[in-house]
């Protein structure tokens, strides 16, 4: 009778250990894949992320916003010309060189507006290059050895009773669910960032049109700061994910499986909070309003 109960207990333990290992395998696989997935997403330029949306935004910008930018350029250049003439002792001290200066400013302003998308794409190409370089370093140093980790944990699980294994299986299920929710939140953050990029790019000709004027130029300058902040937000996202992966990799080899799992849950919450803060951090770094 005792041997039968022992066999039943061992069968239950084997079943629970198998379930726990399955949950852990899925969990660690998600962690490894998430680093690569986020790198692929945040490294996309507006033209590469979704070609259809990009063409729509570019069409709206060129057909709707550029004419408005042309009106703004006209106003800015007229204001600039009047200021240049009147500031020289009320027309009594005029220099023909100022007109060459004005024509140069006009040419620069028109060139910037007509090449707005080239300028904007250059900013995001820089951001993509930085993110791609970071992805290679981060993913190469933080990939979790799933087989070795599971084997190490199995040694500890074999010494547990049925009740403790049942509790551990529930813990792994909850942590795995937490990671799934985190994946959804990360998707929301990444898609929200791209939508913000498209909205910012769509109106680019208007702030760019003001850059040739001293008084209005701060509008265009601040706009470019915001563009660089959006481009380098991807790098900050990669840094957050890299820190997350390193911390999880360190907790996996902890002596207490329960402690390691709850640490994973805590780091997951911290990661989500950090990702939400990357946008404001990037803007503060580039001093963009």
Each predicted region: which residue ranges?
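Gly/Ser-rich, low-complexity
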Residues: 1-72, 88-97, 107-178, 217-222, ...
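Alpha-helical transmembrane segments of helical membrane proteins, especially in multi-pass transport
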Residues: 175, 179-211, 225-247
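Hydrophobic alpha-helical transmembrane segments
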Residues: 67-79, 197
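Membrane-embedded alpha-helices of multi-pass transport/permease systems
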Residues: 75, 120-123, 127, 185-188, ...
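Membrane-water interface regions at transmembrane-helix termini and the short interhelical loops
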Residues: 81-94, 183-187, 215-216
């Amino acid at each position: 009778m005792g041997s039968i109960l022992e066999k039943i207990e061992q069968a239950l333990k084997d079943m629970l250990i198998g379930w726990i290992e399955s949950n852990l395998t899925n969990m660690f696989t998600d962690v490894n894949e998430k680093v690569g997935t986020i790198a692929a997403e945040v490294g996309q330029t507006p033209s590469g992320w979704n070609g259809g949306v990009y063409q729509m935004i570019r069409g709206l910008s060129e057909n709707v916003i550029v004419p408005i930018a042309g009106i703004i350029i006209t106003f800015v250049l007229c204001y600039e010309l009047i200021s240049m003439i009147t500031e020289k002792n009320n027309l009594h001290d005029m220099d023909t060189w100022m007109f060459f200066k004005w024509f140069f400013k006009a040419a620069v302003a028109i060139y910037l507006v007509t090449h707005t998308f080239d300028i904007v794409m250059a900013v995001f190409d820089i951001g993509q290059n930085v993110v791609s370089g970071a992805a290679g370093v981060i993913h190469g140093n933080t990939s979790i050895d799933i087989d070795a980790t599971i084997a190490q944990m199995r040694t500890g699980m074999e010494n547990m009773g049925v009740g403790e294994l049942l509790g551990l299986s529930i813990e792994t299920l909850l942590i795995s669910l937490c990671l799934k929710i985190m994946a959804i939140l990360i998707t929301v953050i990444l898609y929200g960032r791209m939508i913000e990029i498209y909205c910012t790019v769509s109106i680019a000709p208007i702030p760019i049109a003001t850059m040739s004027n001293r008084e209005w130029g701060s509008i265009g300058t601040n706009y470019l700061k915001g563009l660089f902040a959006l481009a380098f937000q991807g790098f900050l996202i990669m840094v957050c994910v890299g820190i997350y992966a390193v911390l999880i990799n360190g907790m996996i080899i902890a002596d207490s499986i329960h402690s390691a799992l709850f640490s994973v849950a805590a780091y997951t919450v911290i990661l989500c909070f950090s990702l939400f803060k990357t946008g404001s951090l990037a803007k503060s770094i580039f001093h963009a309003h």
